[in-house]
Amino acid sequence: MSRAAETLSKIPLATLAIMALCVAVYGYQLLMDPPLQQFTMCPSEVIYLHQWYRVVTSSLFHGSLMHIAMNMMSTMAIGSSLERQIGTIMMALTISWGILLTSATYISISWLLFAVFGLEKMMLQHSVGFR
């Protein structure tokens, strides 16, 4: 068995699944070259245009090879350790809740900065990557 295969065989299921999904999405980005701004988190487009898919896609799309490489290395290290402690189901729920809550927080803070201080640019900003 190669080192890579041995390393992959030691990664727990939920961690491996989220890593595989992110790598597959990045592969799609490289092959199809979709306009990244169609998938990024943009609070105004989520709130006013009801593009709720951005809550999930913004966490799966990455801006560069370095971006995904660093995220996947940290996901492998931290996610594997955490998943061994809390189990696969809890890890999957933690990842899901993490995606939803970080997106909700980002949207809420952007809207609040717009509503209170008139910072419209916060509502129009696009972000990408597993936050």
What are the functions of these language-model segments?
Residues 3-127:
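N-terminal TM1-TM2 helical hairpin plus the immediately adjacent luminal interfacial "cap"
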